[in-house]
Amino acid sequence: MVSTTATAGTTASDDRKRQILALARQHDFLILEDDPYYYLHFGGLDEDAVTRKRGKSYWGLEEEHRERWGTGRVVRFESFSKILAAGLRLGFATGPTEILDAVDANTAMSNLQPSGVPGVMAYKLLNHWGIPGFLRHVDSVARYYAKRRDNFEAKARQVLGESGVAQWVTPVAGMFLWLKLNLPSSGPEEPEGDSFALISDKAKAAGVLAVPGVAFIPDGSKTCYVRTSFSIIEEKDVEEAFCRLRDVVLAAWKEAGKPMRPLA
């Protein structure tokens, strides 16, 4: 379970998380909360970083009801690679002692420990900042990505939205824009088209690359969705990238010999 997905950039509400926690209690299952984008939420960034309210994690929501329901159904995983430096490849976990002890034992048997240099770097930074400094830092990172999101989406709206080539939901956290491309049907089993064929063939040849949605679907079903990222692309290249993507979608309709249908 995640608050903000690395696939679609969608974010679960606190109420939705409470419903899932209730199901975990009812059906006796464990929630593995993989949440590397928790600190990259774009709401509330004009407020004080130390005192402002932040979204609740599954772990935090479970703690709220400790006396009534108890705890132990959530193991939470976070990452420094999204908020300090991608090259650190360092994260941390929070959860029941028995489970984390088993994780430690498995780590000791498999790779002994994470690399020492990234660990020391993260320790020194966190020790220097303290909690207030850390919260100010992550909010500055979130503001950086929020600005990139705004520019990226504005160009997408201008190029893809106005031409009827794609639609999406504005991400409120993370670094991805999940696009539903308006593609011609590739057969009765794929009425909305196949983004993998489009990206791997036409888009790649045009010099633009997005991750086909099939990469994130467990059963490998074909889909019209693609994942685009606004994390590192140069802002001057965004419009051109979307223009190339638009053109290959329009070319797919022309090749199919059909007029492009309006988006629902």
What is each of the regions a protein language model found here?
Residues 1-264:
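PLP-dependent class I/II
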